Amino acid sequence: GDLVVVRVQESVEPGEIGVAVIGDEATVKRIYSDGNIVRLVPENETMVPIVVMRTDPDFRIGGKVVAVIRKL
């Protein structure tokens, strides 16, 4: 139920929370890059990180999360 405010940009600094787009789905994760490998790490430690190749044509960074608005 939270809303996120995203600054549209093509990259984020390592460990920043961003929006990653894979195919037609978007996900909010901490983003880490190591060469051609990108790890999308969830804040929820019970969830498994997603690993994707930077060169995957279905993958892109959609932007950086700059704020979270929580509903009361």
Regions inferred by a protein language model and the residue ranges of each:
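Acidic/glycine-rich C-terminal interaction modules and beta/coil loop segments
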Residues: 2-72
